[in-house]
Amino acid sequence: MLPAVGSADEEEDPAEEDCPELVPIETTQSEEEEKSGLGAKIPVTIITGYLGAGKTTLLNYILTEQHSKRVAVILNEFGEGSALEKSLAVSQGGELYEEWLELRNGCLCCSVKDSGLRAIENLMQKKGKFDYILLETTGLADPGAVASMFWVDAELGSDIYLDGIITIVDSKYGLKHLTEEKPDGLINEATRQVALADAILINKTDLVPEEDVKKLRTTIRSINGLGQILETQRSRVDLSNVLDLHAFDSLSGISLQKKLQHVPGTQPHLDQSIVTITFEVPGNAKEEHLNMFIQNLLWEKNVRNKDNHCMEVIRLKGLVSIKDKSQQVIVQGVHELYDLEETPVSWKDDTERTNRLVLLGRNLDKDILKQLFIATVTETEKQWTTRFQEDQVCT
């Protein structure tokens, strides 16, 4: 059973619980967008964070800024007494009959009562009326599970793409949430949200001493060594830092090369065990061996550290050199799903090919993972498979 989140002191202004009051914004459409019409893919940004951290405030800010985007908002379960919920038609059984509410500025709001796929599929029928989707999760939601559905559903994949995951952390209560111990060795929700994020907003920095913000920032960086950390007040942020990140597609490979060179390895924060590890291995990887390496980590979960603890990878990102391919290949992994995609960047003839990986997760051992990765590059498939024994599978 999950503990109650927050106390009376943590309760957000009632307005935080309501759907943002949207105001008209001027929108323009380029000739290229008009030509592409319904054929253009629509980016989705997942906004996550604990109750009261400022998710709805960020939504309100994004929707009222002058960004020339027509935005659809998906609220993952409305709060009790939500002003928007009163405007939705409800069936006699108490379930939503009409899921969508179209607002005067062209934006859309909906309540997702199921896994979210049906709602987004319905939203696709309104494609052409908007060009960006913001999906706000509940406070305890695992954004990885939400992110995964965009890779699973092939039909959705042709219409939309996951742009990035934004996690908002409350400056006052964030450290408490991140260090909360869970039973049976489970990872607490706040820590998982931070680990999966492409950008982390430390919000309400004006309400706490600078030293507290510094401690929180250090803790966040110890969990996620790759994501950008931004300090905000009232969730106000340069929109280029949260929208159009291309964090999950091949375009991210262009900036990822430089970023991976400066990712710091981290130590577990306090008594927790989530870390960021990074390593580089020169040479080419055989694609089938690379798949085996990733699958043993994400699917079989049969890789253990020196203390014989199972390694759990929450997020995986990297650039690799695949044998017989001229393009750099980006590797993305969330939960049990992963993808290899060629980037627009080619390997130069006068530079050494190399593989850089960043893994975020629990009980990770850099030395063991690096040696296993080297095995994917240098060993035969027969030799490689002997490294994993059935009786070593983690349960």
From Swiss-Prot:
Enzyme class, spelled out: hydrolase
Record-linked SUPFAM superfamilies: Hypothetical protein YjiA, C-terminal domain, P-loop containing nucleoside triphosphate hydrolases
Region (Disordered): 1-22
Conditions for induction: Down-regulated in response to zinc: repressed by ZNF658 in response to zinc by binding to the zinc transcriptional regulatory element (ZTRE) (5'-C[AC]C[TAG]CC[TC]-N(0-50)-[GA]G[ATC]G[TG]G-3') found in the promoter region of CBWD1. Increased expression in response to dopamine treatment.
Tissue specificity note: Ubiquitously expressed. Up-regulated in cultured astrocytes treated with dopamine.
Gene Ontology biological process terms, A to Z: kidney development
One Pfam family cited in the UniProt record for this chain: CobW_C
Alphabetical list of InterPro entries matching this protein: CobW-likC_sf (IPR036627), CobW-like_C (IPR011629), CobW/HypB/UreG_nucleotide-bd (IPR003495), P-loop_NTPase (IPR027417), Zinc-reg_GTPase_activator (IPR051316)
KW Translocase (keyword) present: no
Chief subcellular location: nucleus
Biased composition (Acidic residues): 8-20
UniProtKB keywords: Chaperone, GTP-binding, Hydrolase, Metal-binding, Nucleotide-binding, Nucleus, Zinc
Annotated binding of Zn(2+), by residue: C107, C109, C110
E.C. code: 3.6.5.-
Motif range (psi-PxLVp motif): 17-24
Homology family: Belongs to the SIMIBI class G3E GTPase family. ZNG1 subfamily.
Disease connection: Congenital anomalies of the kidney and urinary tract (CAKUT). A disorder encompassing a broad spectrum of renal and urinary tract malformations that include renal agenesis, kidney hypodysplasia, multicystic kidney dysplasia, duplex collecting system, posterior urethral valves and ureter abnormalities. Congenital anomalies of kidney and urinary tract are the commonest cause of chronic kidney disease in children. Disease susceptibility may be associated with variants affecting the gene represented in this entry.
Role noted for this protein: Zinc chaperone that directly transfers zinc cofactor to target metalloproteins, thereby activating them. Catalyzes zinc insertion into the active site of methionine aminopeptidase METAP1, which function to cleave the initiator methionine from polypeptides during or after protein translation. Mechanistically, the N-terminal psi-PxLVp motif binds to the C6H2-type zinc finger of inactive form of METAP1.
Protein's name in the database: Zinc-regulated GTPase metalloprotein activator 1A
